[in-house]
């Protein structure tokens, strides 16, 4: 089986200013990807898979999105992370789920965050769901 620990496009801006994250670390069962920015300004993704019970696997996914700004120190402009947004997702799948079952779960996650759907629309507008 091929490794899933590969670089991928996290933010697709149509090829202009895309954010790509690359494998950075794998320790204690936690995979980490970061963008090429300095660590303090980098986009960061972590993922772990644990056996949460005798019958379930639990995937924990975390994404950090920095707001990069410029700070002037002694007349020199330096990029800094002004703040960060965090996404935390947990997914529990029974160990007896088939590959087809798991593919359906992935499609549901993709549909959940598809442009135009209520949740990403509310997030993009920094508003509530009503």
UniProtKB/Swiss-Prot annotation:
Q: Which InterPro entries match?
A: Levivir_coat, Phage_RNA-type_capsid
Q: What does this protein do?
A: Capsid protein self-assembles to form an icosahedral capsid with a T=3 symmetry, about 26 nm in diameter, and consisting of 89 capsid proteins dimers (178 capsid proteins). Involved in viral genome encapsidation through the interaction between a capsid protein dimer and the multiple packaging signals present in the RNA genome. The capsid also contains 1 copy of the A2 maturation protein.
User: Where, subcellularly, is it found?
Assistant: Virion
Outcome (variant: residue 46 to A): Loss of repression of replicase translation. 80% loss of binding to the operator RNA in vivo
Name assigned to this protein: Capsid protein
Which protein family is named in the record? Belongs to the Leviviricetes capsid protein family.
Entry's Gene Ontology cellular component terms: T=3 icosahedral viral capsid
Keyword RNA-binding (UniProt): yes
The record's subunit annotation is: Homodimer. The capsid proteins form dimers that assemble by group of 5. Twelve such pentamers are linked together with free dimers. The homodimers binds to the viral RNA via an operator hairpin, but also to many other RNA sequences in the viral genome; this interaction probably shifts the virus from the replicative to the assembly phase and ensures specific encapsidation of the viral genome.
In its UniProt record, a GO molecular function of this protein is: structural molecule activity
Question: What Pfam families does the database record attribute to this sequence?
Answer: Levi_coat
| Main location as per UniProt | virion
**Protein keywords:** Capsid protein, RNA-binding, T=3 icosahedral capsid protein, Translation regulation, Virion
The uppermost taxa in this organism's lineage are: Viruses, Riboviria, Orthornavirae, Lenarviricota, Leviviricetes
